[in-house]
């Protein structure tokens, strides 16, 4: 250690004679001091997945491994390495596990991996059944709320600004998940918020026109969104206003029954207007106030 100290001081001072006299430090000592020589991120990802897929590992260790894996793939390069290392399939396999916590962890990893990451969004869509199982979990009233929330988190990040994902989602009947979640009397405010966020993400990847509006009507999406203006949760109301404002700014026109429903539900939130996004509130109010 003393030799390393002399070498460090000599280097800092630029004293060539002192550097030569001190000699080169032990590389192993440098590794110990500065953390070098440990496994790289891809190796750590493989090791974590090996624990997750090990039938003899207990649930606690699997969940710890999934937490570690998710921290690693917060890095964009590591997230893209999921495809290179062929790890999407084992991740998808955990979504069928009997343990709800493990399913939730898998969904969380998917959501984090594809967040603001076009390459990972595209890679995920290559896997047959991947999007389908996300939709099924989000829609299922048999799933625990925490698991469904994670499914909507994954859907939101997968759909956002990705045209192909939006088309596949709609083709698979994905729009059905929204009225199911928003009309569920047992749905928590957090679940509803995640569902509305996923709808917003879908709209960001879609061409908003009369054809889409007709689809939203037929699938019961539009009515369920408007009805949730009358909820008692400010955060849910704010998300609903954001979606409606998005539709309005895209030029869509509500029919008379929708405007009547909108006005009725809007009256319930008048006392909350100071706690809501002002621009969205006024944009929606203007639509029915001018009729």
Curated annotation (Swiss-Prot):
Q: Name one Pfam family in it.
A: Fes1
Q: This protein is called what?
A: Hsp70 nucleotide exchange factor FES1
The cellular component terms of Gene Ontology attached to this UniProt record, alphabetical and capped at eight, are:
cytosol; endoplasmic reticulum
Q: Where are the ARM repeats?
A: 13-57, 76-115, 119-160, 163-204, 210-249
Q: Which SUPFAM superfamilies match?
A: ARM repeat
Alphabetized PANTHER family for the sequence: HSP70-BINDING PROTEIN 1, PROTEIN FOLDING REGULATOR
Task: State where the protein is found.
Answer: Cytoplasm
Q: Which InterPro entries match?
A: ARM-like (IPR011989), ARM-type_fold (IPR016024), Hsp70_NEF-Inhibitors (IPR050693), Nucleotide_exch_fac_Fes1 (IPR013918)
On the tree of life, the source organism's domain of life is: Eukaryota
């Amino acid at each position: 250690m003393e030799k390393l100290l002399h070498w460090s001081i000599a280097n800092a001072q630029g004293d060539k004679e002192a550097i030569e006299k001190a000699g080169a430090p032990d590389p192993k000592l440098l590794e110990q001091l500065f953390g070098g020589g440990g496994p790289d991120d891809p190796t750590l990802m493989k090791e974590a997945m090996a624990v997750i897929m090990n039938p003899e590992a207990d649930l606690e260790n699997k969940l710890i491994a999934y937490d570690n894996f998710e921290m690693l793939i917060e890095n964009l390069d590591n997230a893209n390495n999921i495809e290179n290392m062929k790890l999407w399939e084992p991740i998808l396999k955990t979504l069928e596990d009997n343990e709800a916590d493990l399913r939730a962890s898998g969904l969380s990893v998917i959501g984090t991996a594809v967040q603001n990451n076009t390459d990972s969004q595209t890679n995920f869509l290559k896997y047959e059944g991947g999007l389908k199982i996300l939709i099924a979990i989000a829609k299922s009233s048999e799933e625990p709320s925490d698991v469904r929330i994670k499914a909507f988190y994954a859907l939101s990040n997968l759909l956002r600004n990705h045209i192909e994902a939006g088309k596949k989602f709609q083709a698979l009947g994905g729009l059905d998940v929204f009225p199911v979640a928003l009309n569920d009397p047992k749905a928590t405010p957090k679940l509803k918020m995640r569902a509305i966020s996923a709808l917003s993400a879908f709209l960001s990847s879609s061409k908003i026109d009369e054809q889409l509006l007709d689809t939203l009507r037929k699938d019961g999406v539009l009515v369920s969104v408007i009805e949730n203006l009358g909820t008692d949760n400010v955060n849910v109301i704010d998300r609903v206003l954001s979606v409606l404002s998005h539709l309005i700014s895209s030029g869509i026109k509500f029919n008379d029954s929708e405007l009547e429903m909108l006005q009725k539900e809007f009256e319930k939130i008048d006392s909350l207007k100071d706690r809501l996004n002002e621009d969205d509130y006024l944009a929606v109010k203007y639509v029915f106030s001018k009729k």
